[in-house]
Regions:
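Metal-dependent nuclease catalytic cores that hydrolyze phosphodiester bonds in DNA/RNA
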Residues: 1-168, 173
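Short cysteine clusters
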Residues: 36, 298-303, 309
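Mg2+/Mn2+-dependent nuclease catalytic core
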Residues: 141, 148-258
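Polybasic (Lys/Arg-rich)
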Residues: 243-302
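Short cysteine/histidine-rich zinc-coordinating motifs and their immediately flanking basic loops
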Residues: 312-322
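C-terminal non-catalytic accessory extensions
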Residues: 320-375
Length: 375
């Protein structure tokens, strides 16, 4: 099956559910759960998993409040207003971009009036044309590219990502710019927010490296430091720093090596399977035909279906639904009923389960001795 045919099949599978554009956050999160083929197929089909979770009756809390979203949009607008004045000022601080030599190009929309995947493909081509001009050392080439679209290969399929900005300076390096709305207070950033920002910047850097490689240029032209622009304190005045993403890049490359291939996804997606926003039961049946690997870490990875998959694991009586410590304590025993039967000496343990069985029987005796059950 050709790439175009598989893309058409994925679009048909998505049915009437809305499509969402992937970004660095969703790519990084999906790579954190490489064993879950369900998530991989839904990501490849650009399914709005938040909407899907709502249809399935297990919506997740919004990742950001409306206030936070509005603040983020306001801050990015502030950074880029007046011809990218603040953006260019911060680039001058971090990478010595000379202001008189700054030439800006906005790639936020394609000249061809299309939408969806076709638009992203066209914008990616227009970004490559701008990059070719820039790397040719044309003195009039734009060297600050707003909303450039680069591509990342994940298991043989192409993911198109819109960058906040790319900048090139006289040292012959391309820099990824990441604009975030969390504040820098007294020159300190909350590490809980800094870690995912660094990881997302690494996704964009890797995407830009792959794009240059496909164009015949060296990936070494991309700096492994990203420029992070955030508000200073609690107002919208920008400040900036550089992020060293080398460790994150190494981890991402390892995860990409483990990502499911397109041929594997083709084999796992049943022919004719579609999602339907109008029929919850049909939607659930379709989702259940996609193999998953629920782990408590799915809740931390930001997967919108984590609550749904946990509910299904709980209904099935799987120990994994009780959390990581419990799952690890029970080792090879996957089902709660088997654990309870083993504690009651109702089933004979295998040689791998004998120590666990002895512990469970001992705990059961202590529980009963304390009056917690029938003697």
């Amino acid at each position: 099956m050709s790439t175009d045919e598989f893309e058409a099949r994925l679009e048909a599978f998505r049915g009437d559910l809305p499509a969402v554009r992937p970004n660095a956050r969703t790519v990084a999160a999906a790579l954190d759960t490489p064993d879950c083929r369900r998530r991989r197929i839904l990501e490849a089909a650009s399914v709005d998993k938040s909407e899907l979770a709502r249809h399935l009756g297990h919506p997740i809390p919004a990742a950001q409040s409306p206030f936070a979203l509005r603040r983020g949009n306001l801050f990015e607008s502030a950074v880029k207003e007046n011809g990218d004045a603040h953006l260019i000022a911060e680039l001058r601080k971090q990478i010595d971009l000379p202001i008189p030599a700054t030439r800006h190009k906005d790639l936020s929309s394609s000249r061809a009036r299309t939408k969806g995947l076709k638009e992203m493909k066209l914008r990616a081509k227009e970004t490559q044309a701008a990059l070719s001009l820039l790397l040719s050392e044309d003195p009039y080439a734009p060297n600050v590219l707003d909303h450039a679209v680069t591509s990342l290969e994940v298991g043989g399929s192409t993911v198109y990502l819109e960058q906040d900005a790319l900048a090139h300076y006289t040292g012959n390096k391309l820099y990824v710019v990441e604009i975030k709305s969390f504040p820098v207070i007294n020159n300190q950033v909350d590490p809980v927010k800094l870690r995912p920002a660094t990881r997302q910047a690494a996704v964009y850097i890797l995407s830009l490296q792959q794009t240059l490689a496909r164009m015949g240029h060296s990936p070494e032209k991309v700096a492994t430091d990203a420029v992070l622009i955030c508000p200073r304190n609690y107002d919208l005045t920008p400040t900036s720093a550089t992020l060293d993403t080398r460790q994150e890049l190494r981890g991402l490359r390892r995860q990409l090596d483990r990502a499911a291939s397109v041929s594997e996804l083709e084999a796992l997606l049943p022919q004719g399977l579609t999602l339907s926003a109008a029929d919850t039961e049909h939607c659930a049946e379709a989702v259940e035909q996609l193999p998953n690997a629920y782990r408590p870490a799915c809740l931390d990875s930001g997967c919108e279906l984590a609550y749904y998959c946990r509910s299904r694991a709980r209904d099935a009586g799987e120990t994994v639904a009780l959390g990581t410590p419990v799952r690890q304590a029970f080792g090879p025993v996957d089902m709660i009923d088997d654990v309870l039967a083993m504690a009651d000496s109702g089933i004979a343990p295998s040689r791998y389960e004998q120590d666990l069985a002895a512990d469970l029987i001992h705990m059961q005796k202590l529980y009963r001795a304390a009056g917690g059950g029938a003697a």
